[in-house]
């Protein structure tokens, strides 16, 4: 499972021109589910995301986590995070999980993050074309992969 975390001043998701979710200050998290992902990937990523100190403290240092502040979260599924560009110029998405595998794992990530943070998480809509709007804060953008725990 791979996530791209962006610290934002605001973010929203629209489907066919209709806004379906929005947040103010917080994190936009893009989630890509891989064919081999399982519950342990969710558990590791949720713990990492919740404790990641990427918000500024009173001195301006990135020393504060989602658990420490009242920030919003919006999670959006994005299978293209598992694109392979090794051969040719057209990306391959063979490593991305099919919907029957990806949907329960994506929803499991959202549910687990809600439990970890004790707050409602806003989401996109799985499997449809979305318009994601955001204002980056920083910018701060971090990629984390449960299969490559650096």
What is each of the regions a protein language model found here?
Residues 1-88, 97, 103-150:
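N-terminal, polar/charged subdomain of small-to-medium soluble alpha/beta proteins
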Residues 93:
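Glycine-rich, phosphate-binding/catalytic loops in enzymes
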């Amino acid at each position: 499972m791979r996530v791209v975390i962006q610290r934002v001043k605001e973010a929203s998701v629209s489907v066919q021109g209709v806004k379906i979710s929005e947040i103010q200050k917080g994190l936009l998290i893009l989630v890509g589910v891989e064919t081999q992902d399982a519950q342990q990937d969710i558990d590791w990523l949720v713990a990492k995301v919740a404790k990641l100190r990427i918000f500024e403290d009173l001195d301006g240092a990135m020393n504060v986590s989602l658990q420490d502040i009242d920030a919003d979260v919006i999670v959006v599924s994005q299978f293209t995070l598992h694109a392979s560009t090794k051969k040719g110029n057209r990306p391959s998405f063979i490593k991305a999980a099919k919907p029957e595998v990806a949907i329960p794992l994506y929803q499991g990530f959202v549910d687990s993050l809600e439990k970890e943070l004790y707050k409602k998480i806003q989401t996109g809509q799985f499997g449809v074309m979305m318009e994601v709007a955001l204002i980056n804060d920083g910018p701060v953008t971090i990629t984390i992969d449960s299969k490559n725990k650096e």
